[in-house]
Amino acid sequence: LHVYDAKDEYFEALKGKYEPEEKRQIIGDKFLEIQRRVAKELNLNPDEWLLGQGTIYPDTVESGGTKNAHKIKTHHNRVPEIEEMIKAGKIIEPIKELYKDEVRMVGRKLGLPDKMIDRHPFPGPGLAVRCLCLENTDGEFKTHEVPGFTAHQLPVKSVGVQGDERTYRHPLVLEGDHDWATLRDLSPKLTNSSKEINRVLFMVAGGPIESVSVTPGYLTKERITTLQEADKLVMNALEEIDKEKLVWQCPTVLLPLSINSEGQESIVLRPISSTNVMTANFTELNWQKIQELGQEILKIPGVSAVFYDITNKPPGTIEWE
């Protein structure tokens, strides 16, 4: 097994990049560049070796690679150069026609351990698509009228899906009394009634919101370290909070937004339940334990607030970018 550490090359390639689709394209191209270089260093003849990928069917659909699908986002294993290699017979993808639940069925047939089969999926581009980047404010911080709640539209955007098409809109954050039944009913009503929003969040810690400011930033080691610390807290907490294994995946997202302060950032928890990942529902976890987790995350230097993503798929994709 040969492992190549390419993090410095990726940080350099992504320096100053903010747009989600551009980030994904750069990551896919860099992946191929490094693969070819390392193969050459190992004296591997490209005419005798194939590139193996763990591509699954949703990757192809969301990249617009099926007959009737529009592109939602480019997966790193579906950049144009990869498509050319597929046509040339240079790539092998043994599970490309399977959904994620079917991949797990194959894993069980092979006798793989449950801990390996049931672990949360992790995106090919890594935390790069969970670390949102902004140079300037993207839209305005403004209030929406939502009976029973304080509702603020945040000056940042995330990727979503409507039908087979991509959306790129704002999240709306709610503050008020927590009740899962109310939020379950309210969230889709809010996204369906506004062309400005494609996600709904609920405040966990750091509120009430009085001001929001953008903390300009792209992908840096420091920001990724902050996100890794938060993600570790979340994954460890889920061992206790989600003993029933309701959560299929829980991305932890870093937003370049400072709540009631300057120069800080915010964390979003995105636990979802799904079978095939083409659709998903946000997971309704024990709220008291989520609030306790939120307070622990606030102890991370530079984190000003914690939100809980209460958006289904559609209209919100599982990953924010």
Predicted regions and their residues:
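ATP/NTP-dependent adenylation/nucleotidyl-transfer catalytic domains that generate, transfer
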Residues: 1-321
